[in-house]
Structures are given as C-alpha cells and as structure tokens.
Amino acid sequence: MDLYPEENTQSEQSQNSENNMQIFKSENSDGFSSDLMISNDQLKNISKTQLTLEKEKIFKMPNVLSQVMKKAFSRKNEILYCVSTKELSVDIHDATGKVYLPLITREEINKRLSSLKPEVRKIMSMVHLGAVKILLKAQFRNGIDTPIKIALIDDRINSRRDCLLGAAKGNLAYGKFMFTVYPKFGISLNTQRLNQTLSLIHDFENKNLMNKGDKVMTITYIVGYALTNSHHSIDYQSNATIELEDVFQEIGNVQQSDFCTIQNDECNWAIDIAQNKALLGAKTQSQIGNSLQIGNSASSSNTENELARVSQNIDLLKNKLKEICGE
C-alpha cells in the first residue's frame, strides 16, 4: 500500500514513493534538522508479536459466519519508522538547568502525519519511543574544566524520582560528550503533554565562563521513534536503559595552553529536574528547585570525610603523647 499521496512534493522533502520512504531536511541560521520516515512494508524482515483473539473459541457460529467475522476483524499494522536529527547552539544563559528542551513535539509528529494519505493518517494513534542519542560539543578550546550534567526525563510523571529516563555527568574539557538513552515505551498521540515526554535538562556548571548571549555549546540529538495504529505493534531491542559513550579523550592538540586535570572520582552529584521549567529560549521565571541526587548524598560524604580527618588527628596526637612519655 502506498502510504504517501502523489501530490505532496515540498522543496524540503525528498520522496521515493516506490520505496515508501521520505526524507525531510531543513537548515538555517538557527541550526539543522533532518528526518527519515519509512513504511512497515519496507521492513518485513523485522519480526513482530501479534496479539490475536480466536473468536471461534468464544462464540459458537457457523463456518460461513466465522469466515465473515475473521475478515471483518482482521487488522493490518501500519508502522512508520522515523529518525529525527536536530542541531542547535545553546546560550550559556540557557545552560543552567532552568529550562528544558523537548526532543519530540506534537508539531513535528503532525508534520510527518500530514504527508500520509488521509485513510492512513486517520488511524495513526501511537508513538513508540525507541532511542535517543545526545551529543554535546563545546564552542570553546579544549582543556577548560567545564563539568556538565544532563538528565532526560518524562516530565508528565509527577514523581521526580520516577520521571527519570537517564542521567549522566561529563566534562566538555575534551571537546565533546555523548550518551544514549532507550525509553522503550509507547504513548497515545492524544496525551495532553506530549511535548514533555522527552525533556532534556542540561546544567553547565562553569556559569562564569561566558556572558549572556554567548553560545557555549552545540546540542545534536537523534530520536528514533515509530508512528503506529496500535500499542501492540512494536518490539524493542534488549538494550540497557542508558549507555555512556567512551569519548573522554583528548581531541587534537592544545599547544601553548595548559590542559586541566579532571577528577573522575566524583560519584555523588545532583541535578535540578523540577517541573514547570521554561522552554529553551523562552523567558525564565523564578521557581522552587527539585534536585535529584545521583549516588550517596553529598552531606553524608562530607560527614564521612570529617570523621576520617578527626580519627587521623587523634592517631597523630596519640603518637605525640607516646614520644613525650618516652614510650
């Protein structure tokens, strides 16, 4: 079945109706975006688990009626596999953990659906979130100590602990930082806060590095998702929930600049993932923070360090007393 109407030809769209595939591209001064959409007919080699109910085992009916019922209740899975890529520069003022970046939006999905034939578009009801790969790249020289914290959350969920899809901490001193999150769940296209389902929060700790208006880094992300007419259409690969890419290495030659020493022993950190954050680029409002602690609490760690120092001082004092007493 050809999913795309023949008259739909846009300048930003490359269409191959024979292969049921479309590519959307857009680039301007704000950034670059690219989207791929391919129909299920081109991916028949992917195995799917079908949910079936044998009506003949529930109702006693004549054979002719049975055949009519089977035909009447047969259903074809319509699946569009989509890959969306976007790149944008981030102002240092917007990199303080006070705003969120929606990685998938209703506007984007509606744009994809508008390219389909009406009979296919009207039955699409679900979006299945497969994977999100995020790459941060510094817009300054290598070697500057610039820790950064990232959290991907489902901001529809009220509990700040349960909303977390993945979190990571890195350092842009090496030029870039990348990780992948696998949400692996489906949601209705009619859900009220669809734009908040994949919310990216980023906290650039070296806030005095530049002034407001200066672009501190580039965020490039790829979202793999599928649009379907059923919640039972998709199986996910058995990946881990989050994967951290091994990109903590020097990139290029710094020359005449001192390269900082980065401490990798910090396992306890927190990031503010409070609800009702402003959209990236919008005016921010004062709000009550809600930090998610990763690892043990910092206060507990400080207490343990203090106890260790006290114990060490007691041992030193004990040795001095032994020397004075001639023991």
Curated annotation (Swiss-Prot):
Keywords: Coiled coil, Host cell junction, Host-virus interaction, Transport, Viral movement protein. Belongs to the caulimoviridae movement protein family. Transports viral genome to neighboring plant cells directly through plasmosdesmata, without any budding. The movement protein allows efficient cell to cell propagation, by bypassing the host cell wall barrier. Acts by forming tubules structures that increase the size exclusion limit (SEL) of plasmodesmata, thereby allowing viral ribonucleocapsids to spread directly to neighboring cells. Residues 297-327 form a coiled coil. It comes from Cauliflower mosaic virus (strain CM-1841) (CaMV). This is Movement protein. Homotrimer, through the coiled-coil domain. Interacts with VAP. May interact (via N-terminus) with host prenylated Rab acceptor protein 1D (PRA1D). It is found in: Host cell junction, Host plasmodesma. GO terms for cellular component: host cell plasmodesma. InterPro entries: Caulimoviridae_Movement, Viral_movement. It comes from the Viruses. The keyword Membrane does not apply. One of its GO terms (biological process) is transport of virus in host, cell to cell.
